C-alpha cells in the first residue's frame, strides 16, 4: 500500500486510487514552499505533488493576493448572506471581476461557488440566492395539542372531564396489562 501526497491510498493489487477532495493547510504550505524554492516552476510542482493545473494556479493566486494565511482562510466552509452573494454577482456581471478574481477579492474558496450563484440568480433571481433548508423536514406531532385554557366554568368542567377520561383509560389499560401478565406466569 502506497500513500500519496493527496492523503489517499494506492492499492497495488486492485490498481484503485481513493483521494480525499480537500487538502489541508500544511500540504498547501508545502506546495507553495516547493514552488518558491524551485524558481516558481509550476509544471515541476504539479508533477511532484500530482496536482491539477487549476488547483495549483488557484493556490498561487491566493498566496500572491493574501499571503500564506490566504490558503488557510479559504479552506473553511462558510455561509454567505444573500446580500453578499448579490454583491459578488453584480461585480462579475458588471465586468469588474472575473469569477476567479472575484473569489480572490471577496475571499471565496472556489470560483465554482460563484458560478453556482450566477446560475441560481439567472434562473430564479434574488430568490435563488436565499439558502434552502437542509435535512429532513420536521415530523408532525403524534398527539393532539392540549386545548387552550378554559374561559368559562363550563369549559373548565369539560376540560376536567377530558382529563379524567384519559386517566381512566390509562388505568384500565394498565389493569388489563397486569391481568395478561398474571395469566402468562406459570404456577409454581
Curated annotation (Swiss-Prot):
Natural source organism: Haemophilus influenzae (strain ATCC 51907 / DSM 11121 / KW20 / Rd)
PANTHER family for this protein: INSERTION ELEMENT IS150 PROTEIN INSJ
Family: Belongs to the IS150/IS1296 orfA family.
Region (Disordered) location: 133-153
Record-linked InterPro entries: Homeodomain-like_sf, InsJ-like_HTH, IS150/IS1296_orfA-like, WH-like_DNA-bd_sf
Name assigned to this protein: Uncharacterized protein HI_1720
Amino acid at each position: 500500500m502506497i500513500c500519496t501526497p493527496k492523503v489517499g491510498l494506492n492499492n497495488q493489487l486492485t490498481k484503485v486510487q481513493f483521494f480525499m477532495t480537500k487538502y489541508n493547510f500544511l500540504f498547501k504550505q508545502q506546495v507553495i514552499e516547493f514552488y518558491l524554492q524551485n524558481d516558481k516552476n509550476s509544471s515541476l510542482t504539479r508533477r511532484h505533488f500530482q496536482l491539477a493545473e487549476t488547483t495549483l494556479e488557484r493556490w498561487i493566486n491566493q498566496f500572491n493576493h493574501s499571503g500564506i494565511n490566504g490558503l488557510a482562510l479559504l479552506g473553511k466552509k462558510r455561509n454567505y448572506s444573500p446580500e453578499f452573494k448579490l454583491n459578488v454577482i453584480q461585480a462579475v456581471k458588471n465586468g469588474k471581476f472575473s469569477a476567479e478574481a472575484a473569489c480572490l477579492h471577496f475571499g471565496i474558496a472556489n470560483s465554482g461557488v460563484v458560478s453556482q450563484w450566477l446560475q441560481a440568480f439567472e434562473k430564479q433571481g434574488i430568490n435563488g440566492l436565499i439558502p434552502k433548508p437542509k435535512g429532513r423536514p420536521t415530523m408532525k406531532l403524534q398527539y393532539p395539542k392540549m386545548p387552550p385554557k378554559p374561559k368559562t366554568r363550563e369549559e373548565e368542567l369539560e376540560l376536567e372531564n377530558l382529563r379524567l377520561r384519559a386517566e381512566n383509560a390509562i388505568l384500565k389499560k394498565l389493569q388489563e396489562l397486569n391481568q395478561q401478565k398474571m395469566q402468562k406466569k406459570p404456577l409454581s
